[in-house]
Amino acid sequence: MSKPRQSTLDPEDKKYLEIPDSEVVLPAAVDSYLRQKLKDQSLKECSSHVAAFADCSKDKYISVVWECRELQQLMKNCLVEYTTSERLIGMKREWVDASKKRIYEKRLQKELESKEPTPKK
């Protein structure tokens, strides 16, 4: 197993944020993952509302429409509150910033390696 990579970056160093966003590509798989993560977080935050609606609708078919309407609306309002585009944008921003940090660390590492003297034979 490989060891976890040690960061060569000072935790206070925020120069990596100077890397333009255009150098970081958000792959479709990451976008999909972040959307799923947002959905999972929202369901966790609204678990009491989701459970209440699920309990109400257990033994009902068509009557669920009018018998569980209030619980469904509470669940929907909660999910809408937590599943916002602002939260998704924030998650994407965190991912982009983490990518910038990795890019910056790689550049620093290359600079350090290029400055090291080569051993003479």
Curated annotation (Swiss-Prot):
Q: Which cysteine pairs are covalently linked by disulfides here?
A: 46-78, 56-68
Name by which UniProt lists this protein:
Uncharacterized protein DDB_G0275933
What are the UniProt keywords, alphabetically?
A: Disulfide bond
Q: Which Pfam families match?
A: Cmc1
Kindly give the PANTHER family that the UniProt entry links to this protein: COX ASSEMBLY MITOCHONDRIAL PROTEIN, COX ASSEMBLY MITOCHONDRIAL PROTEIN HOMOLOG
Q: What InterPro entries does this protein's entry cite? A: Cyt_c_biogenesis_Cmc1-like
Motif range for Cx9C motif 2?
68-78
Look up and give the organism this protein is from.
Dictyostelium discoideum
Can you list the GO cellular component terms from the UniProt entry?
mitochondrion
Give the motif span (Cx9C motif 1): 46-56
Q: Which family does it belong to?
A: Belongs to the CMC family.
Span of domain CHCH: 43-86
